[in-house]
Amino acid sequence: MQVIEAIYEDGVLKPLKKLKLKEHSKVIIKIIDEEELEKILDSMVIEKVEGIDYKKLKEAYYESL
């Protein structure tokens, strides 16, 4: 399974990174827009740990997608 970011432009989803797929592979795509992802992340229950910068943690999560 891969999680990728893409831009929707002119009726086409365009991946921001090269996909590791064989030509003509059939895939299933679940669309989660940035607003929905933000709600999901904000709803997660994370125990607050002293000394952790949660803003940087959230940024690292986005970068890992």
Swiss-Prot record:
Keywords: Toxin-antitoxin system
Keyword Acyltransferase: no
Disulfide bond residue pairs: none
Keyword Lipoprotein in annotation: no
InterPro entries: AF2212-like (IPR008203), AF2212-like_dom_sf (IPR024069)
Family as reported in the entry's similarity comment: Belongs to the UPF0165 family.
Function of the protein: Possibly the antitoxin component of a type II toxin-antitoxin (TA) system.
Identification of the protein by name: Putative antitoxin PF2058
Organism of provenance: Pyrococcus furiosus (strain ATCC 43587 / DSM 3638 / JCM 8422 / Vc1)
Organism placement in taxonomy: Archaea, Methanobacteriati, Methanobacteriota, Thermococci, Thermococcales
